[in-house]
């Protein structure tokens, strides 16, 4: 039976009364964002809005993005990525569980030196997938677009990991799983968290 979104007590600074708010709202107040599902337009818009708000509230103060995601839509993930690069605040990315596909892309997109993973996390990279129906010309247009996106993602991964583009292209041809330590050696993250942060 689903338990719904947990609620926790919270008292506004200087406030007299305690109120019950969602755990996610409470985490936002600590500059913590949790991506715990597929990346789609809805969750991307929420994450982008929170990042923009937190950055405007206290520019330059770290924002923490915890990731436990199997991936999702490329366009939605790129929107989050662009926002991470746009804001003044550093984005600390932390893999808890699984960062696969677009989840690993966002993990690697954190501020260099601040990309982390818990010891038993799994990270997976692969090429984007897509499907289309329709006339042959429509399928050809879609195929060209997915190849363009694949090249764009490969270039960003190469930049974020310092791996040669040819290696990224080879490794992303199929599902490529890594442990947290292997992801560190690959350059996707900077540190495996062994102690509390």
From Swiss-Prot:
Organism: Trichormus variabilis (strain ATCC 29413 / PCC 7937)
Predominant subcellular localization, coarse grouping: cytoplasm
Keywords, comma-separated and alphabetical: Cytoplasm, Hydrolase, Protease, Serine protease
Family stated for the protein in its record: Belongs to the peptidase S14 family.
GO cellular component, as recorded: cytoplasm; endopeptidase Clp complex
Entry's Gene Ontology molecular function annotations: ATP-dependent peptidase activity; ATPase binding; serine-type endopeptidase activity
Assigned EC number: 3.4.21.92
Protein name: ATP-dependent Clp protease proteolytic subunit 2
Disulfide bonds: none
Active-site residues, as the UniProt record annotates them: 101, 126
């Amino acid at each position: 039976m689903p338990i719904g979104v947990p609620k926790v007590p919270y008292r506004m600074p200087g406030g007299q009364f305690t109120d019950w708010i969602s755990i996610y709202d409470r985490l936002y107040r600590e500059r913590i964002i949790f991506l715990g599902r597929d990346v789609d337009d809805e969750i991307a818009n929420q994450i982008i809005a929170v990042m923009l708000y937190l950055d405007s509230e206290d520019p330059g103060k770290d924002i923490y993005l915890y990731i436990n995601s199997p991936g999702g839509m490329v366009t939605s993930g790129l929107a989050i990525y662009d926002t991470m690069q746009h804001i003044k605040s550093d984005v600390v990315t932390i893999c808890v569980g699984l960062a696969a596909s677009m989840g690993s892309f966002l993990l690697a997109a954190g501020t260099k030196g601040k990309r982390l993973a818990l010891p038993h996390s799994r990270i997976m990279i692969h090429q984007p997938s897509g499907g289309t129906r329709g006339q042959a010309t429509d399928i050809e247009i879609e195929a060209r677009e997915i190849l363009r996106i694949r090249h764009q993602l490969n270039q960003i991964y190469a930049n974020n990991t310092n791996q040669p583009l040819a290696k990224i292209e080879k490794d992303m041809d199929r599902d490529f799983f890594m442990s947290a330590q292997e992801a560190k050696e690959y350059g996707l993250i900077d540190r495996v968290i062994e102690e509390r942060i």
